[in-house]
Amino acid sequence: MAKLRHIAMQVPDLEKAAAFYEGVFGLRRLKKVEAPIGNAISLSDGVMNLTLLHFPEGTKRGKDGPHWAGLHHFGFVVENESVTEQEIKKHGGEFFMQLPTYPGVDAEKKFKDINGVVFDVSEHGWG
C-alpha cells in the first residue's frame, strides 16, 4: 500500500515559514536547497516530510507568482514507480512532468489526478 509521506507548500518567505513550523510543531530541518528551478527547505516530524517552496520571479514553477501561498503538491512513497504509473493512467490520471536533476533536488515524477491536482510518486522518499 502507498503511504502519504510528503506535502509541498509554496510560501512567499522560506525562512519565516520554516521558523513557524519548527517553532510551533517542533519539525526538524533536513535541508535547504537553492536551485535554478526554485528554492526549498525540507522539514520533518520523523515520518512526514513538509517541503516549503519558493519560486523567485522568472522561474515559472510557482503558482500565481512568488507571493502566492498554499498547497503546491503532495507525494506518495510507493514500492514500484512503473506499476504505480500504470495504475494512475488506468484510473484517469496523467503524467505531468519529470523534474530536471539538480544537486539536492529530489527528481521525482509528477502526475495529475482526475481533477488536475499535482502529486509525486517516489520509491525513495524525500528529505
Language-model features and meaning:
Residues 70, 74-88:
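Mid-chain, well-packed structural core segment of small domains
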Residues 42, 85-127:
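Vicinal oxygen chelate
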Residues 51-53, 120:
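Conserved beta-strand in the GNAT
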Residues 8, 28-34, 98-102, 126:
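Conserved catalytic-core motifs of GNAT/GCN5-like acyltransferases
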Residues 38, 58-63, 97, 104:
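A short, acidic/glycine-rich surface segment
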Residues 1-16, 71-76, 122-127:
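N-terminal beta-strand motif that seeds the catalytic metal site of vicinal oxygen chelate
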Residues 2, 10-50:
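Core segments of cupin and vicinal oxygen chelate
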